Amino acid sequence: MGKEKVHINIVVIGHVDSGKSTTTGHLIYKLGGIDKRVIERFEKEAAEMNKRSFKYAWVLDKLKAERERGITIDIALWKFETSKYYCTVIDAPGHRDFIKNMITGTSQADCAVLIIDSTTGGFEAGISKDGQTREHALLAFTLGVKQMICCCNKMDATTPKYSKGRYEEIVKEVSSYLKKVGYNPDKIPFVPISGFEGDNMIERSTNLDWYKGPTLLDALDNINEPKRPSDKPLRLPLQDVYKIGGIGIVPVGRVETGVVKPGMLVTFAPTGLTTEVKSVEMHHEALTEALPGDNVGFNVKNVAVKDLKRGFVASNSKDDPAKEAANFTSQVIIMNHPGQIGNGYAPVLDCHTSHIAVKFAELITKIDRRSGKEIEKEPKFLKNGDAGMVKMIPTKPMVVETFAEYPPLGRFAVRDMRQTVAVGVIKSVEKKDPTGAKVTKAAAKKK
């Protein structure tokens, strides 16, 4: 068993009928961790319901249905392997929480797989102003998904079938759009596939012998290995805080950057409470250190439950410790707000694990969301489809960072009226020093 394969997260994006479920289902079916017995059960049910046509999509439909009914699906079902990577498919965008998940960073994707419907009419619907192809691509780029693979799907249903001309037309148009969003199309493989028939998914297809590039599986294998940010200073947003008899207080969260280890002095922002880490554990096993991506619990000394809350951020006291944000400037894209957003708007921001109302104190500029260039200074308002720079002031103590330095703490969703009305990334933060920050006895000894 040579070296462990690297884990990567893939997000599958594209218009509603582009064939995302079929394509993803196909990969999971052929390369994945779905038990053959489960597949046979699904196949039998599909046949009984005359659902032959849904060959692979129903694999996902069943998984989704079981998940939504609260049957916990073994997450291994959403995984598949290439020769180089273990791939996890994180929520495909049909899911209403997808945008929120993508932003709050429960799932940072390393690569986006954009599925395009190549059929007559299908492609045009997806790429049109109202189509989701553009919005998903823009979101992926804004949220820092640097790598992309583009699949020209349904090649078995073009006119004529497997049409090279149609493929070239699509590559040209999608490239020009992706370039406007900010991607470099020369670095994006455009793979003609049929998620349904299986052409160029895993094996090279004779139906598409004019195409000399990689299959989808090859393209996934060629993804650049993501750099995990373990060399950055520690940032660990708290998800929960437990009091465990005989042990004490155990904050729990995911290491986003840096490392945490026993004996380390940590400072919790926004309050500035400083203490020593006694032990770190993951899945009930003690660790000598936890790395980015690890969900851990760690035991801290001389701390009361009331001192820590979800949304607080643990950091290394001696290496750029996290602090409360007095205010910050963000680039936001308004996605679905029925009216106009002006100065004084105060929605809730979901950023890492915090969920805090923030005031839009000042609309600084309106920018062209395609080119990123400034269109207007101090606009009176922003409306659907607009992008702008906004100065924001939290209504309660909050910890955020710039997207450039600490990506998971620098992107957010703006929630209002029970939906995501905007998304954004933080460009700069003005921090304030904590007043009367408590240093525990254990920490004072270590200093």
UniProtKB/Swiss-Prot annotation:
Domain of life of the native organism: Eukaryota
Range of residues in the leader sequence: none
Region (G5): 194-196
Listed CDD domains: EF1_alpha, EF1_alpha_II, EF1_alpha_III
Residue(s) carrying N6,N6-dimethyllysine: K55
Stretches the record annotates as G4: 153-156
Main location: cytoplasm
Keywords: Cytoplasm, Elongation factor, GTP-binding, Methylation, Nucleotide-binding, Phosphoprotein, Protein biosynthesis
Protein name: Elongation factor 1-alpha
Source organism of the structure: Vicia faba (Broad bean)
